Protein backbone atom coordinates (compact mmCIF):
# COMPACT_ATOMS: atom_id res chain seq x y z
CA UNK A 1 0.00 0.00 0.00
CA UNK A 2 1.50 3.33 -1.07
CA UNK A 3 1.92 6.11 1.45
CA UNK A 4 0.80 9.71 1.23
CA UNK A 5 3.03 11.87 3.39
CA UNK A 6 1.63 14.93 5.16
CA UNK A 7 4.26 17.55 5.98
CA UNK A 8 3.43 19.18 9.32
CA UNK A 9 5.31 22.08 10.87
CA UNK A 10 4.59 23.58 14.28
CA UNK A 11 1.35 25.57 14.33
CA UNK A 12 -0.04 23.59 11.40
CA UNK A 13 -3.69 24.10 10.49
CA UNK A 14 -5.19 20.82 11.67
CA UNK A 15 -8.45 21.17 9.74
CA UNK A 16 -6.70 21.56 6.37
CA UNK A 17 -5.61 17.93 6.16
CA UNK A 18 -8.35 16.20 8.16
CA UNK A 19 -10.72 15.35 5.29
CA UNK A 20 -7.90 14.15 3.02
CA UNK A 21 -6.45 11.94 5.74
CA UNK A 22 -9.84 10.41 6.55
CA UNK A 23 -10.64 9.70 2.89
CA UNK A 24 -7.24 8.14 2.26
CA UNK A 25 -7.02 6.17 5.50
CA UNK A 26 -10.62 4.89 5.63
CA UNK A 27 -11.71 5.02 1.98
CA UNK A 28 -13.35 7.84 0.05
CA UNK A 29 -16.80 6.42 0.84
CA UNK A 30 -17.89 3.80 3.39
CA UNK A 31 -16.83 0.35 2.16
CA UNK A 32 -14.61 1.88 -0.54
CA UNK A 33 -11.18 0.37 -1.06
CA UNK A 34 -8.32 1.87 0.93
CA UNK A 35 -5.44 2.25 -1.55
CA UNK A 36 -3.24 4.56 0.54
CA UNK A 37 -1.76 4.83 4.00
CA UNK A 38 -1.40 8.24 5.67
CA UNK A 39 1.97 9.12 7.21
CA UNK A 40 3.30 12.35 8.71
CA UNK A 41 6.66 14.05 8.40
CA UNK A 42 8.27 17.01 10.10
CA UNK A 43 11.78 18.45 10.44
CA UNK A 44 12.49 16.15 13.39
CA UNK A 45 10.54 13.41 15.13
CA UNK A 46 9.75 15.71 18.03
CA UNK A 47 6.00 16.29 18.47
CA UNK A 48 4.51 19.16 16.47
CA UNK A 49 1.50 21.13 17.67
CA UNK A 50 -1.40 22.36 15.58
CA UNK A 51 -3.14 25.71 15.79
CA UNK A 52 -5.99 23.83 17.50
CA UNK A 53 -3.73 22.29 20.12
CA UNK A 54 -3.37 18.76 18.73
CA UNK A 55 0.09 17.24 19.21
CA UNK A 56 1.33 14.89 16.50
CA UNK A 57 4.33 12.61 16.71
CA UNK A 58 5.68 12.49 13.12
CA UNK A 59 6.26 9.11 11.49
CA UNK A 60 9.23 10.46 9.54
CA UNK A 61 11.75 13.26 9.71
CA UNK A 62 14.09 14.64 7.05
CA UNK A 63 16.53 11.77 7.58
CA UNK A 64 14.26 8.79 7.06
CA UNK A 65 11.63 9.77 4.53
CA UNK A 66 10.97 6.81 2.23
CA UNK A 67 11.70 6.88 -1.50
CA UNK A 68 8.52 5.04 -2.40
CA UNK A 69 5.41 7.12 -1.75
CA UNK A 70 2.53 8.50 -3.80
CA UNK A 71 2.12 12.06 -2.61
CA UNK A 72 3.58 14.87 -0.53
CA UNK A 73 0.95 17.11 1.05
CA UNK A 74 2.08 20.36 2.70
CA UNK A 75 -0.46 21.39 5.32
CA UNK A 76 -0.72 25.13 5.92
CA UNK A 77 -0.04 26.94 9.14
CA UNK A 78 2.04 29.64 10.72
CA UNK A 79 5.56 28.24 10.18
CA UNK A 80 5.92 28.20 6.39
CA UNK A 81 7.81 31.51 6.45
CA UNK A 82 10.30 30.29 9.07
CA UNK A 83 13.93 29.29 8.42
CA UNK A 84 13.14 25.67 9.31
CA UNK A 85 10.61 25.48 6.48
CA UNK A 86 13.47 25.96 4.01
CA UNK A 87 14.57 22.43 4.88
CA UNK A 88 11.46 21.13 3.09
CA UNK A 89 12.51 22.60 -0.30
CA UNK A 90 14.63 19.58 -1.37
CA UNK A 91 11.74 17.21 -0.58
CA UNK A 92 9.41 19.19 -2.83
CA UNK A 93 12.02 19.43 -5.59
CA UNK A 94 12.51 15.67 -5.54
CA UNK A 95 8.79 14.91 -5.37
CA UNK A 96 8.09 17.08 -8.43
CA UNK A 97 11.07 15.62 -10.30
CA UNK A 98 9.84 12.10 -9.48
CA UNK A 99 6.32 13.01 -10.67
CA UNK A 100 4.67 12.51 -7.28
CA UNK A 101 1.47 14.29 -6.33
CA UNK A 102 2.39 17.51 -4.49
CA UNK A 103 -0.17 19.62 -2.65
CA UNK A 104 0.05 22.87 -0.71
CA UNK A 105 -2.78 24.66 1.08
CA UNK A 106 -2.93 28.14 2.62
CA UNK A 107 0.56 29.33 3.61
CA UNK A 108 2.05 26.11 2.22
CA UNK A 109 0.86 27.25 -1.23
CA UNK A 110 2.71 30.53 -0.62
CA UNK A 111 5.79 28.49 0.30
CA UNK A 112 5.54 26.62 -3.02
CA UNK A 113 5.26 29.92 -4.90
CA UNK A 114 8.19 31.47 -2.99
CA UNK A 115 10.45 28.74 -4.32
CA UNK A 116 9.30 28.90 -7.94
CA UNK A 117 7.38 25.62 -7.90
CA UNK A 118 4.16 27.25 -9.17
CA UNK A 119 5.57 29.45 -11.94
CA UNK A 120 4.57 27.12 -14.78
CA UNK A 121 1.37 25.57 -13.45
CA UNK A 122 -2.12 26.85 -12.76
CA UNK A 123 -2.42 27.52 -9.04
CA UNK A 124 -4.22 29.41 -6.30
CA UNK A 125 -3.53 30.69 -2.79
CA UNK A 126 -4.95 33.08 -0.21
CA UNK A 127 -5.60 35.71 -2.96
CA UNK A 128 -3.07 36.99 -5.47
CA UNK A 129 -2.42 40.10 -3.35
CA UNK A 130 -1.57 37.99 -0.30
CA UNK A 131 0.66 35.79 -2.42
CA UNK A 132 2.57 38.72 -3.94
CA UNK A 133 2.98 40.30 -0.50
CA UNK A 134 4.85 37.22 0.77
CA UNK A 135 6.79 35.87 -2.20
CA UNK A 136 10.03 37.13 -3.65
CA UNK A 137 11.57 37.33 -7.07
CA UNK A 138 11.49 33.57 -7.69
CA UNK A 139 7.73 33.76 -8.20
CA UNK A 140 6.91 34.74 -11.77
CA UNK A 141 3.68 32.79 -12.12
CA UNK A 142 1.04 35.44 -11.52
CA UNK A 143 -0.38 34.87 -15.04
CA UNK A 144 -1.11 31.28 -13.96
CA UNK A 145 -2.97 32.34 -10.82
CA UNK A 146 -6.61 31.17 -10.70
CA UNK A 147 -9.03 32.69 -8.21
CA UNK A 148 -10.63 29.45 -6.96
CA UNK A 149 -10.79 27.49 -3.72
CA UNK A 150 -8.45 24.80 -5.09
CA UNK A 151 -6.65 24.22 -8.37
CA UNK A 152 -5.16 21.03 -9.79
CA UNK A 153 -2.69 21.22 -12.66
CA UNK A 154 -1.30 17.80 -13.41
CA UNK A 155 0.07 16.47 -10.14
CA UNK A 156 0.33 19.83 -8.37
CA UNK A 157 -2.61 20.93 -6.23
CA UNK A 158 -2.97 24.24 -4.40
CA UNK A 159 -5.73 25.73 -2.27
CA UNK A 160 -6.50 28.76 -0.18
CA UNK A 161 -6.93 28.46 3.56
CA UNK A 162 -10.71 28.07 3.34
CA UNK A 163 -10.60 25.48 0.56
CA UNK A 164 -9.91 22.34 2.57
CA UNK A 165 -12.78 20.37 1.03
CA UNK A 166 -11.89 21.37 -2.52
CA UNK A 167 -8.22 20.63 -1.75
CA UNK A 168 -9.27 17.18 -0.57
CA UNK A 169 -11.30 16.55 -3.71
CA UNK A 170 -8.49 17.59 -6.07
CA UNK A 171 -5.92 15.48 -4.21
CA UNK A 172 -8.23 12.47 -4.37
CA UNK A 173 -8.54 12.98 -8.12
CA UNK A 174 -4.78 13.38 -8.58
CA UNK A 175 -4.13 10.19 -6.60
CA UNK A 176 -6.95 8.36 -8.39
CA UNK A 177 -8.11 7.33 -4.93
CA UNK A 178 -11.54 6.21 -6.17
CA UNK A 179 -14.00 6.73 -9.01
CA UNK A 180 -14.98 10.27 -10.01
CA UNK A 181 -18.52 9.50 -8.83
CA UNK A 182 -17.34 8.45 -5.36
CA UNK A 183 -15.01 11.45 -5.04
CA UNK A 184 -17.79 13.89 -5.98
CA UNK A 185 -20.28 12.17 -3.68
CA UNK A 186 -17.83 12.39 -0.78
CA UNK A 187 -17.10 16.05 -1.50
CA UNK A 188 -20.79 16.99 -1.68
CA UNK A 189 -21.57 15.08 1.50
CA UNK A 190 -18.89 16.95 3.48
CA UNK A 191 -19.79 20.25 1.80
CA UNK A 192 -23.57 20.03 2.28
CA UNK A 193 -23.95 17.64 5.23
CA UNK A 194 -27.03 15.65 6.07
CA UNK A 195 -29.22 18.74 5.71
CA UNK A 196 -28.31 20.53 2.48
CA UNK A 197 -29.95 23.91 2.11
Q: Where in the sequence are the language-model features?
A:
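Active-site-adjacent pocket-lining segments in enzyme domains
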Residues: 2-5, 12-13, 19, 26-44, ...
Amino acid sequence: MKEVIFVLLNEFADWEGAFIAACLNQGVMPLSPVPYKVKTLSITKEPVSSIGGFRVLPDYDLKDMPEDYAGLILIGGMSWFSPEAELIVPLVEKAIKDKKVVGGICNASVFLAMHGFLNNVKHTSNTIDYLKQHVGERYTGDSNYVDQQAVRDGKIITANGTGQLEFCREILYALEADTAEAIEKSYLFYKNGFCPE
